[in-house]
């Protein structure tokens, strides 16, 4: 099984940007933990980060037929990007939205996710563990999809 992890703007600054909100782990630390958990679950991951909305859209579009699940921390684009929402809806690859912090306990403008309606689920507020839970959820989503395909 193949999982595409996409990380949006400013996540390259993890470990130095607002550690009281996002934690002290760097994105490289999180990636290492994700790779370890994915290996335990016999899954492969591709882990990417971009500050550019269009690049994230391109990666989502390219995922069709190559990845079983997309996991996305769209960061600030979560609340603003119709382009990401439309790309997720268009490709038909099951997508899980994740966030390190509990966005609902933060500023009001962070409470609305434009991508949530086209994602199969959300994992928020567990820090680095959000990413580990997303690996486990991806395996679960993939198993459900395989069961549905076998039933047809």
Regions found by a protein language model. Give the residues of each.
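Short Gly/Thr/Asp-enriched flexible loops that form oxyanion-binding sites at enzyme active sites
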Residues: 81-91
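Short acidic/histidine-rich motifs immediately flanking catalytic phosphotransfer sites
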Residues: 63-70
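Short beta->alpha junction loops
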Residues: 44-54
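Extreme N-terminal starter segment of soluble prokaryotic enzymes
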Residues: 1-3
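Glycine- and acidic-residue-enriched helix-capping/strand-helix junction motifs
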Residues: 14-28
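Short glycine-rich anion-binding loops that position phosphate/pyrophosphate groups of nucleotides
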Residues: 9-11, 75-78, 101-103
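Short, glycine-/small-residue-rich phosphate/pyrophosphate-handling segment
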Residues: 46, 96, 105-149
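Short acidic active-site motifs
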Residues: 55-59
